[in-house]
Swiss-Prot record:
Keyword Membrane (UniProt): no
Sections of the chain in a coiled coil: none
Compartment(s) where it occurs, according to its Swiss-Prot or TrEMBL record: Cytoplasm, Cytosol; Nucleus, Nucleolus
Keyword Cytoplasm included in the entry's annotation: yes
Pfam family of the protein (one): Urb2
Designated name of the protein: Probable nucleolar pre-ribosomal-associated protein 2
Any GO BP annotation: ribosome biogenesis
Key words, A-Z: Cytoplasm, Nucleus, Ribosome biogenesis, rRNA processing
Length: 1318
């Protein structure tokens, strides 16, 4: 096909549009065999011509848009062509035309592809600014875009505009509006043309959605500028450009009203944006004015809507009011126009309340109006009280919210006393249980009154209430306001002149009412007691004595009338307990304890009965002020009256009472009740966590007896729960086990959680023994599948065994054998089992320790075939590990004989295991190896046993691959096993080879240094030299990775500590140090894992005398330290970094103490190291990690250094400046030798700059106060040793801020440092 034919077929206006786009695609992909230079430019021009056709075959054909996008994204088009192509044919009319077709028939893929083309083209600023765009054209484009999204929002939820599209569209709109002579007018016109579509999209979204964020960003940055907001909000009301006029120009349906609050939020965000921007384009006063106008314009518009449903309009107004009340823009009082809008909202809300429509919305509206401007509502209090009276439900949360805000508003307006009077008058005319007696409202009022009412106001109110005729009426609400006022008083600040009023209430009302107390209704009885409780806290000694008769009368009536209601009984008991507490405080009870005992015991008895029909309170917001829940008395007894219970109740009664509470949780399945979030459970946790519980002996002992009693509970009553705490011992454990009920893990979990909170020292030895016995028995009753319950039990058992139990627990070894048997295949039990065994052995009585251990070993021998191997190995390991500390015990030969016999039997078991073909349990095999290791450490094995172990070792090596035992516990024990059996250089190197090999398999591996020390002690001189030389050869080879180096360095550290080969060969020391330093220069390794091991080797050598280290070795260590402190990359946790710094300081200490003769001439190196360490002591800012001219410790992250590291650094520098501290303890002022004096003088020539660095660091970094104080005291020692010339030199080297700090440093030294030394 010729070029002319090809172009004609593609551009033919009468040709098939589908064929043409296919041919254009082939041409672009190079599938047409024709030479066509600049074919991409030809295709773009063709596509622009076709896309502007008014036909759905082209402008909404995804093939055209996809091809355009592919070519435009390619690098085949020049920049000049792109600019000229869009200048000739803008994409705006093409996209508008496509949107017209998409409105009729939506195609999601085409719409998204057009958006991609728009971004791809106009994200280029050169193209954007040469494009011919007009505000009307762009506004129409944006309007149709929003309309399309709003109409097809369900299809586009997963395709919201990204940041690139949003930024591109913002640039396009800004370019269009700023091209006009008046950008403000263009922006206002843009909003006028697009507002309908914007609101249509807003009504389909909500705040926080991607489309809302998109509209918010576009309008904030492009349209709602400072000047546009002035035009919309601050122009004359008859202007057509006001916001209200723009909104009125749109026809609204009820659903569109949802968009108005969101549009209000966008406008408010725009005002906030201009206020908080860097340019600060508007002031706070201007922002407040704009916010008020924005609010009033929206409310005025909504009030003008007459044909829409009232409910929808009111909801919209409420949303706007709630946004307005919570913003932080408006300040001061409302202007006249806004105040008028608020009054209209008040009238509308009251009207709907009277009509009993939109109930909740109207109350929320009134609450919001109070928050906006309470001056609108407070003058209309009479109307508001009428609305309150119309509330028929006490739990109306919307009206309750309004009431609480009304109280706070009255307090702000300083008319809270008037509110109280109106409240008292209105509550008399309402039902007994009304919203004015709601508990939440009373609490809220009391909190406000406590800080708002003056003493004079309270005095006047109380006097008025006491003189009111209604106070003597029979209305049960007559005490509501009086009680609320009394509740707001605090004993620390109450007015003393109120006491006569309280006395008058007690005499004239309370005591008078007691004569006919049983005649009163339950609510009046409860309210009388509640008021009197508020008075009791202000009792004087005379008042408590005068009130004693009344209290006894009240209690006698309470005892006589068994059918009294719950609230009346509970409040009466609370009053009696409060009275007794005050009498104790005033010491007016004298010797009469009968009455307090009767009151407390009756309270315990009644609270237990109330719990039998357990029902928790609903939310407090639903309760009347006198309402109580059945557990309420229990809660106050647990958390407030515990001391009263301790003083006036017997231990038996307290135990029974605590048991009745705990049983509600323990027997949870019988109640079928979930108590996870219950008030009772939270207060129980508070009770068992309180220190007061354990300070009161009777409470503490009763709690522990209760837990024992719960564990002793029996379904067939074979064991009496009451007598169980006193009689239970280990002798009847079998009988007890057969009679106990199988409880669920939930039941046991309650006891365990309770035991966790009890301090171990609070539990007596006998109680610990009983608890241990019961917990062990319960563990047997739990299912084997309840691993979590078993582990929890074991942890509690271990906690209880930390302190000695009764001797019976240690007499019979069967107990410990039974305890170790569960979880034999679960490694999660192993750790806690080991701890339990060690505690048991530790607390064995020294007198019969040998007999018990021997008896235990004999039991193991007798039942070797019946007991699980895991149990045997666990007990055996713990026993053998304890033998070195128990060599002085009797029968040691018999014990060792039994140990070796059991060990031989275990070796036979392992040999039998190896002969089997099936797979082995790595856990079991690991435990068996651990036993062999423990016996090897005793170093008392016979040659026959050693031969067996060598044969076993060979057997494991032969089957190492088939065993597939690659788990960490087995590998650690296997390596230690070989280490303990090594008797030559080759054996030791084989152990090292195993360590390197398995280190790659399982990662970090730990080993016992003492075992390697034992292996080293068996090596001859030649074997030790042979082993260390081979290890050094490995370190210098290039075949090791970082894991190999880590293991080998640890082995070298063991050699350095425990072998004498380095003492014989100083050249060998230098080789080791060179190998360690080689690690830091190897670029293929990550040195973070190796530095710690290398520093351990350095530390070991520097702590030895100069016989070990030559001058070359000394220089090697200094070079290594400098290298570490200048590493570019090191990934470590802050804790590891602090450990590295500490080790570097320890190495410097070692050099200073043992190798000072080598330090001359190298002080500049030490200065560089100490300078890096000094800058590691300060807390770095994230933006200031490095300062020009300062060598920082690069790998050290900007985290705070632990204080003990700073102390070590200060100790090093102090010792350096006072060498006599190294040999003359606590004699800092003793005279120095000539050599020491020269050493200090040579040091200060360099350390004077360290002092200037410290001053400079204080001007750059924010140093922790404690760190700064330690460093300052430390540098006093440096300053003390400086000559006058050096002091002046330090001053010259500093800048102005550092000089100021230095001068203060010198003055403080002259004032404090010398005085401290004296």
């Amino acid at each position: 096909m010729s070029l002319q034919t090809l172009t004609k077929r593609i551009r033919d206006k009468n040709g098939s549009r589908e064929d043409q786009i296919d041919l254009a695609n082939k041409l672009f992909r190079g599938e047409v065999d024709v030479y066509f230079p600049n074919k991409e430019e030809f295709i773009i021009n063709f596509l622009l011509d076709r896309l502007k056709e008014n036909s759905n075959l082209t402008c909404v054909n995804i093939g055209y848009w996809q091809l355009f996008l592919n070519i435009w994204k390619s690098d085949k088009l020049s920049g000049s062509f792109r600019v000229s192509a869009i200048r000739r044919q803008s994409l705006y009319p093409i996209i508008l035309n496509a949107f017209e077709y998409l409105i009729k028939e939506f195609k999601k893929d085409v719409f998204l592809k057009i958006s991609d083309v728009f971004v791809c083209v106009y994200s280029n600023l050169n193209i954007l600014y040469i494009s011919r765009s007009f505000p009307d054209q762009i506004s129409l484009l944006f309007s149709r875009y929003c309309y399309l999204i709003a109409s097809k929002i369900d299809d586009l939820l997963d395709s919201h505009p990204n940041e690139v599209f949003k930024e591109t569209l913002i640039c396009v709109i800004q370019s269009a509006v700023h091209s006009q002579a008046s950008s403000t007018k263009a922006q206002t016109q843009f909003l006028h043309q697009t507002l309908g579509s914007i609101l249509a999209l807003l009504c389909k979204t909500q705040k926080g959605d991607p489309y809302f964020s998109f509209l918010n960003a576009v309008l904030m940055k492009c349209v709602l500028t400072q000047h546009t907001l002035d035009v919309l909000l601050l122009t004359k009301k008859d202007s057509s450009m006001t916001l209200c006029s723009l909104l009125n120009a749109i026809s609204f349906e009820p659903i569109n009203l949802k968009a108005i609050p969101l549009f209000f939020i966008i406008c408010a965000d725009s005002i906030n944006f201009h206020l908080s921007s860097v340019e600060k384009s508007i002031s706070q006063q201007k922002a407040s004015e704009l916010m008020y106008k924005l609010f009033s314009e929206h409310i005025a518009f909504l009030l003008s809507l007459k044909n829409l449903p009232e409910e929808a309009t009111l909801d919209c107004m409420l949303s706007i009011c709630q946004v307005f009340e919570n913003d932080n823009l408006h300040r001061g009082h409302s202007d006249e126009y806004t105040f008028a809008m608020l009054e209209q909202l008040l009238e509308l809300s009251v009207k709907t309340l009277r009509q009993n429509t939109c109930w909740s919305t109207s109350w929320e509206m009134l609450s919001s109006l109070l928050a906006i401007d309470f001056d609108v509502l407070l003058p209309h209090s009479k109307i508001l009280w009428e609305c309150i009276k119309s509330v028929s439900h006490q739990d109306d949360i919307h009206a309750l919210k309004f009431l609480k805000r009304w109280v706070r508003a009255s307090a702000k307006a300083r008319i809270l006393d008037s509110f109280c009077i109106d409240w008292h008058l209105n509550v008399q005319t309402m039902s007994e249980r009304s919203i004015l007696t709601n508990r939440d409202f009373i609490t809220s009022f009391s909190a406000v009154a406590e800080v708002s009412l003056s003493q004079i106001s309270i005095k006047k109110l109380v006097t008025w209430l006491m003189s009111s005729e209604s106070i003597m009426s029979e209305n049960s609400n007559r005490f509501v306001v009086y009680y609320s006022l009394c509740k707001s008083l605090k004993r620390e600040s109450y007015p003393a002149h109120l006491v006569p009023n309280f006395e008058l209430f007690t005499r004239s009302i309370f005591n008078a009412s007691l004569k006919n107390f049983n005649i009163l209704d339950e609510r009046s009885q409860a309210l009388l007691c509640m008021c009197q409780i508020s008075h009791v806290q202000f009792f004087s000694s005379d008042m408590s004595i005068s009130a004693s008769v009344g209290m006894k009368t009240l209690f006698e009536d309470l005892m006589a009338e068994k059918s009294r209601g719950l609230s009346s009984t509970v409040w009466s008991l609370q009053l009696l307990l409060c009275y007794l507490e005050q009498c104790l405080r005033l010491n007016t009870l004298h010797e009469d304890t009968t009455f307090p005992m009767r009151v407390v015991n009756y309270a315990l008895e009644y609270s237990s009965k109330a719990l039998d029909k357990f029902a928790e309170n609903s939310h407090l917001i639903l309760l009347d002020m006198v309402d109580v829940g059945k557990p309420d008395l229990v809660l106050t007894l647990l958390c407030r009256w515990l001391h009263m219970v301790h003083l006036y109740s017997s231990r038996t009664s307290i135990t029974s009472w605590i048991y009745s509470i705990a049983s509600k949780f323990y027997f949870i399945d019988s109640l079928n009740l979930e108590t996870k979030d219950s008030v009772l459970e939270s207060n129980w946790e508070r009770f068992i966590s309180s220190t007061e519980t354990y300070e009161l002996d009777s409470i503490r002992d009763s709690l522990i007896d209760c837990l024992i009693r719960l564990l002793c509970y029996s379904s067939n009553n074979a064991i009496d729960p009451v007598s169980a705490p006193g009689n239970l011992d280990f002798d009847n454990s079998a009988e007890l086990c057969s009679s106990l009920t199988r409880f669920t893990p939930k039941n046991i979990d309650f006891v365990l959680k309770s035991l966790i909170h009890i301090p171990i020292h609070s539990i007596t030895k006998n109680q610990r023994t009983r608890l241990l016995n019961l917990l062990i028995i319960h563990e047997k009753l739990l299912s084997d599948k309840d691993n979590s319950a078993h582990i929890s039990l074991r942890k509690i058992i271990y906690t209880l065994m930390k302190t000695p139990c009764s001797s019976g627990f240690y007499r019979d070894p069967k107990i410990i054998i039974d305890l170790m048997q569960f979880g034999k295949t679960d490694l999660s039990f192993h750790k806690v089992h080991v701890l339990i065994m060690r505690s048991w052995i530790q607390h064995l009585d020294e007198g019969n320790k040998s007999e018990v251990i021997l008896k235990l070993l004999q039991l193991i021998l007798a039942d070797f075939r019946e007991l699980p191997l895991e149990t045997i190995t666990l007990i055996f390991n713990a026993l053998v590990d304890s033998l070195p500390t128990s060599k002085h015990i009797k029968n040691s030969n018999d014990i060792l004989s039994s140990v070796f016999t059991i060990n031989d039997m275990l070796i036979d078991e392992m040999t039998a295991y190896l002969s089997k073909k099936e797979s082995l349990c790595s856990g079991t095999f690991s435990c068996l190896l651990a036993c062999c290791n423990s016996v090897l450490r005793t170093q008392n094995l016979t040659s026959e046993s050693l031969n067996k172990l060598h044969i076993l070792k060979v057997g494991i090596e032969e089957k190492a691959i088939s065993l597939k035992l690659n788990e960490l516990p087995f590998l650690e024990n296997w390596i230690l096993f070989q280490c303990l059996l090594s008797f030559g250089g080759d054996d030791f190197l084989k152990v090292v080879a195993y360590m390197v090999y398995y280190r790659r398999t399982v990662g970090e591996m730990s080993f016992r240094v003492s075992d390697f020390e034992l292996a080293l002690s068996r090596l001859s001189t030649n074997d030790a030299d042979y082993a260390i030389l081979n290890i050094l050869n490995l370190l210098t080879s290039n075949e090791c990775d970082e894991f190999d180096y880590s293991v080998l360095m640890k082995v070298v550290g063991v050699f350095a500590n425990y072998s004498d080969c380095f003492q014989r060969n100083r050249h060998l020391v230098h080789m080791v140090l060179l190998c360690c330093t080689h690690v830091f220069y190897n670029q293929t390794l990550k040195p973070a894992t190796l530095i710690d091991s290398a520093l351990d080797v350095f530390l070991c050598f520097v702590q030895k005398t100069s016989k070990f280290i030559s001058l070359d070795s000394f220089n090697t260590i200094l070079t290594a330290l400098s290298t570490i402190l200048n590493l570019k990359e090191l990934e470590c946790e802050p804790k590891d970094h602090a450990n590295l710094i500490l080790k570097i300081i320890q190495i410097l200490n070692g050099l200073l103490f043992n190798h000072r003769s080598y330090m001359s001439g190298r002080f500049h190196v030490f200065y560089s190291i100490l300078k890096s360490l000094l800058y590691s002591m300060v807390q770095h800012d994230s933006e200031m990690k490095k300062i020009k001219g300062i060598a920082l410790m690069n790998f050290y992250k900007p985290k705070k250094v632990p204080i003990h590291v700073v102390q070590s650094f200060c100790r090093l520098l102090t010792t350096w400046m006072n060498p006599n501290l190294m040999h003359d303890s606590n004699k800092k002022n003793s005279s120095l030798t000539d050599a020491e004096r020269l050493f200090v003088k040579a040091t200060t020539k360099h350390f004077v700059f360290l002092l200037t660095d410290f001053m400079s660091a204080q001007t750059v970094y924010q140093i922790d106060i404690q760190v700064k104080e330690l460093l300052t005291n430390c540098f006093y020692n440096v300053y003390e040793n400086l000559s006058n010339h050096e002091k002046q030199m330090a001053l010259v080297a500093m800048n102005a801020p550092s000089k100021s700090l230095y001068q203060k440093f010198v003055n403080d030294y002259l004032i404090f440092a010398k005085w401290n030394e004296a």
